């Protein structure tokens, strides 16, 4: 039952993405090894408890390994998931990574240089 509740939460967020973003469709496959997005709920990783591979990087992961981990998503309660909840945001965040989106501060075209900001702040304080 816990696993099914988790799956329903993820499916709810996937449905929201499909409704809001033209051209995006998540397809369920019959065999786990055929899936590009493979979600675990307890996979230890240096990335932390909740993480996802970004974009096509998932295609380079062994087919028996997860490409996303959602340890923070519980399945103890039934009744789905509410938009705006912490779990909803967490699932959305990781699914968007799966679709190829990076954090804004990691984008190569960002309008600022993080190392320069640190240097300027340090120089200014002196």
Predicted features along the sequence, with ranges:
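Zinc-dependent metalloendopeptidases
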Residues: 1-126
